[in-house]
UniProtKB/Swiss-Prot annotation:
Activity regulation details: Inhibited by dichloroisocoumarin (DCI) and N-p-tosyl-L-phenylalanine chloromethyl ketone (TPCK), but not by other serine protease inhibitors such as sulfonyl fluoride PMSF and 4-(2-aminoethyl)benzenesulfonyl fluoride (AEBSF).
InterPro entries documented for this protein: Peptidase_S54_rhomboid_dom, Rhomboid-like_sf, Rhomboid_protease_S54, TPR-like_helical_dom_sf, TPR_rpt
Gene: gluP
UniProt cross-references to SUPFAM superfamilies, sorted A to Z: Rhomboid-like (SSF144091), TPR-like (SSF48452)
Predominant cellular place of this UniProt entry's protein: membrane
GO biological processes: proteolysis
Compartments where located: Cell membrane
Pfam annotation, one family: Rhomboid
Protein name, as recorded: Rhomboid protease GluP
Active-site residues (renumbered): S288, H339
Length: 507
């Protein structure tokens, strides 16, 4: 009797030492444990009870299946599997082997029964717990004192686990979300300032208040790498980012403390703006890069201490990252480069700062060096890359064109357009500016080069047709408009111009 009880507590302690988490363990003869990752079971139940008849096994298995189903539903898991181990002095008197060999299935829950019999102790232990040393359970341990000592050792392990969980829970008490709420208030305030000064969707207003604008950054307005994180384009953009910052920022600030959170948030905002500066020529604004930096900080915790992460936060944060990235790639006009840059910046900033009392100074220093090297390297590339310099020129020219400053556009782009590798976008904006000031021959030459680079650009063929018709080169005009109609047959203005050119040829 005492040997079986001794074995029961020894097995429980063995499982805890093997990474199992105690869910329930009191004065009763029942212990529930959560299995570590990559185990064949999700849960293990140790049940010390003398079985008389097989029907007791059947009834108990069905009851445990219902309990596991409730747990599965609460945790939102797709499936759960329980290893249900009976510790019984004797086996049931009737036919029980068939029950013990068959896994009980009920919907998305499965229960695998097993018996450890006092009369077949070593054989059963070897079958159910092959990693357990059966030599530790011999007749010399069959005493009340040894059983109590084994029980006390197990309970001490339970207390140790509880202390560890309290320590992990204390991670969320390192700071109050002061800066999170401050940034939320600041971005709401800035939104109203934008609205009363021209509108938050007005590009000129956004740029005036500090939006990321590549040409101005290249001219030395470095503060534009930081100021976009408090500006938002429209009420929907503000609402989405405010909700995201409230849900993610509060968790990060509680984990890392307010000081570390501030540095992570600002570093992520800057790296997000740098990535946008390098990969996107368009003006941009928003806290998305900094918010993705918060996700990066949580991702760092997930990778550096996976068990604590799963117990305190869970896998939902990974789902949030995937959903946000997927949403960004699926919807047009989303600055994904800024999102990814912020995610990377937040990750390395978190690794450099670490959680409070984290230690590991060497790794943190390396992370800080990597963060700075990445930021400086990409910024240097953005400032000196020919393609990026051209993108900045195109953006600047587009703004001048919208303001009606066509001659300034030609002055800005003529030198770049003379290069053989000038992009189609640059050639097209210079061409339409030349059209506005009457430089038709120059515009024709530019558009002819543009359609060679982008042969499916129907708008350029249409503009070419207009220019050829203006110069009375009707054969060329007809050929150009036919190509435009072929590329976009439903465009009515193309068809109208085609009819006009054909009529002029006939007359």
């Amino acid at each position: 009797m005492f040997l079986l009880e001794y074995t029961y507590w020894k097995i429980a302690a063995h499982l805890v030492n093997s990474g199992y988490g105690v869910i329930q363990a009191g004065e009763s003869d029942e212990i529930w444990l959560e299995a570590p990752d990559k185990s064949s079971h999700d849960l293990v139940r140790l049940y010390k009870h003398d079985l008389d008849f097989r029907q007791e096994m059947v009834r108990d298995i069905e009851e445990q299946a219902e309990r596991v189903e409730r747990v599965r539903h609460q945790l939102g898991r797709r499936r759960m599997k329980l290893l249900n181990v009976f510790f019984s002095t004797e086996a049931p008197v009737d036919d029980w082997e068939e029950i013990a060999k068959k896994t009980f299935e009920k919907g998305t829950v499965s229960v695998e029964p097993a018996i450890v019999r006092g009369t077949m102790l070593r054989d059963d232990l070897q079958a159910v717990f092959p990693s357990f040393r059966t030599e530790d359970c011999s007749e010399e341990h069959a005493s009340f004192e040894n059983a109590q000592m084994a029980r006390e050792r197990f309970l001490s392990l339970v207390l140790k686990q509880e202390e560890q969980r309290k320590t992990e829970a204390a991670v969320f008490q390192n700071g109050k979300p002061t800066f999170t709420y401050l940034f939320i208030a600041l971005q709401i305030l800035m939104f109203f300032l934008l609205e009363i000064n021209g509108g938050s969707t007005n590009t000129e207003t956004l740029v005036a208040f500090g939006a990321k604008e590549n040409s101005l950054i290249a001219q030395g307005e470095w503060w534009r790498l930081l100021t976009p994180i408090v500006l938002h384009i429209g009420i929907a953009h503000l609402a989405f980012n405010t909700l995201a910052l409230w849900s993610v920022g509060t968790a990060v600030e509680r984990m890392y403390g307010s000081g570390r959170f501030l540095l992570i948030y600002l570093a992520a905002g800057i790296t997000g703006s740098i990535a946008s500066f390098v990969f996107s020529p368009y003006p941009s604004a928003g806290a998305s890069g900094a918010i993705f930096g918060c996700l990066g900080a949580l991702l760092y915790v997930a990778l550096s201490n996976r068990k604590m992460f799963l117990r305190t936060i869970g896998t939902n944060i990974i789902v949030i990252i995937i959903i946000n990235l997927g949403f960004g790639f699926a919807v047009s006009n989303i600055d994904n480069s800024g999102h990814i840059g912020g995610l990377i910046g937040g990750f390395f900033a978190a690794a450099a700062l670490g959680l409070p009392k984290a230690g590991a100074f060497g790794k943190r220093l390396l992370s800080a060096v990597l963060l700075i090297a990445l930021a400086v390297g990409f910024l240097y590339y953005g400032l000196h890359s020919p393609s990026h310099q051209e993108s900045a020129l195109i953006q600047q020219a587009s703004e001048l064109y919208q303001e009606g400053k066509y001659e300034e556009v030609t002055e800005l782009l003529n030198g770049e357009a003379a290069q053989k590798d000038a992009s189609a976008d640059l050639l097209k904006i210079l061409a339409v500016s030349d059209i506005q000031i009457g430089e038709y021959d120059q515009a024709v030459s530019l558009l002819e080069r543009a359609v060679k680079k982008e042969p499916k650009d129907h708008a350029s063929y249409y503009n070419l047709a207009l220019l050829y018709a203006e110069k009375n080169e009707l054969a060329q005009a007809e050929k150009a408009i036919q190509t435009a109609v072929k590329l976009k047959p439903k465009e009515q203005r193309y068809k109208e111009l085609q009819r006009q050119i054909e009529n002029n040829k006939e007359s």
